[in-house]
Swiss-Prot record:
Underlying gene: rpoA
Similarity comment: family membership: Belongs to the RNA polymerase alpha chain family.
Protein name, per record: DNA-directed RNA polymerase subunit alpha
Organism whose genome encodes this protein: Jasminum nudiflorum
An annotated Gene Ontology molecular function: DNA-directed RNA polymerase activity
Gene3D superfamilies hit by this protein: 5' to 3' exonuclease, C-terminal subdomain, DNA-directed RNA polymerase, insert domain, RNA polymerase, RBP11-like subunit
Cellular component GO terms held in the UniProt record: chloroplast; DNA-directed RNA polymerase complex; mitochondrion
Keyword set includes Cell membrane: no
Length: 355
């Protein structure tokens, strides 16, 4: 066994990648260290990160296959070497990378004879295949193979439900996890009261994310989960004096926004905007437009005007409204009354985020 020498910090907590490699298009490996940690801290951090890596990161999969004139899943088709079931299993193995929000459609239309591979799939522009060589079927005769596909972005597992195959639709068990495996080890050094720990973290991914990207996303998800605990339970809302509703006079949009914008400074003091990332569940796919412009946190949004956002490619006004409404509902709910209230969330969002 070869002992490796790894230089670590003895003062400031630091992390770094000590090994990174691409074993194949569908297998990436990365090894990271975090130090110095006090006794017990390494295990606490490792357990949380490993669970987040395996359960909190979203992935993209083919979840349904549609084809006419197929009697059942275990039937065979003349001119195709594989059974329908084998073709479904081949679709299950295809690794996708996407900026998708929810579901979308794709298709294959190929004429034999020849091999059908992942590169024959016709995809929307925001979905790409990690390995185009993945095998789907072998056509032994000059027949047409036309298949419709449903693609979904989600997390964890999706078990196929009982279905009626008469419509030619077949669900597929989906594994949305981009991280194939994650291990950790802990090494101690020092003595007495100066004893510390080094955390080694190993990550394997399916190629849709690099191990470093997976680690960053897992950490962001953990931060999002812990943020509510940073706020006092008795903390009240700046809107609480208005009871159930916020009366909106028949003013122009800008007048309403100016009126609500005065509360921005107070809200900013109460929320660690710098620590709230916007790539959370239930956010629309337009987040990827923001990400492309290096907007990751709510604080990043604060530094942009409405005009700045509207200049971004593929971003429409209704998209901006939608994402800000969701962010307001999710991150500012702790400052609103517990009882049901009525408020124009779009105006509320604009009053906070736009100067």
């Amino acid at each position: 066994m070869v002992r490796e020498k790894v230089r670590v910090s003895t003062r400031t907590l630091q992390w770094k990648c000590v090994e990174s490699r691409e074993d194949s298009k569908r297998l990436y490996y990365g090894r990271f260290i975090l130090s110095p940690l006090r006794k017990g801290q390494a295990d606490t951090i490792a357990i949380g990160i490993r669970r987040a890596l395996l359960g909190e990161i979203e992935g993209t999969c083919i979840t349904r296959v549609k084809s006419k004139n197929v009697p059942h899943e275990y039937s065979t088709i003349a001119g195709i070497q594989e059974s329908v079931h084998e073709i479904l299993m081949n679709f299950k193995e295809i690794v996708l990378r996407s900026n998708l929000y929810g579901t979308c459609d794709a298709s294959i239309c190929v004429r034999g004879p020849g091999y059908v591979t992942a590169q024959d799939i016709i995809l929307p522009p925001y979905v790409e295949i990690v390995d185009n060589t993945q095998h789907i079927a072998s056509l032994t005769e000059p027949i047409d193979l036309c298949i419709g596909l449903q693609i979904e972005r989600n997390r964890g597992y999706l078990m196929k439900m009982p279905h009626n195959s008469q419509d030619g639709s077949y669900p597929i068990d989906a594994v949305f996890m981009p991280v194939r495996n994650a291990n950790h080890s802990i090494h101690s050094y020092g003595s007495g009261n100066e004893k510390h720990e080094i955390l080694f973290l190993e990550i394997w991914t399916n190629g849709s994310l690099t191990p470093k990207e997976a680690l960053h996303e897992a950490c962001r998800n953990l931060i999002d989960l812990f943020i509510p605990f940073l706020h006092k339970e008795e903390e009240t809302s700046p809107l609480e004096d208005n009871h159930h509703t916020v009366p909106l006079s028949p003013l122009t949009f800008h007048d309403k926004a100016d009126k609500l914008r005065k509360r921005k400074k107070e809200i900013k003091k109460k929320i660690a905007l710098k620590s709230i990332f916007i790539d959370q569940s239930e956010l629309p796919k337009v987040y990827n437009c923001l990400k492309g412009s290096n907007l990751y946190t709510l604080l990043d949004l604060l530094n942009k005007s409405q005009e700045d956002l509207m200049k971004m490619e593929h971003l429409r006004l209704e998209d901006v409204n939608h994402i800000l409404v969701i962010l307001a509902r999710k991150h500012f709910a702790i400052y609103l009354p517990n009882k049901k209230f009525e408020i124009d969330f779009e105006i509320y969002c604009y009053s906070i985020f736009f100067h």
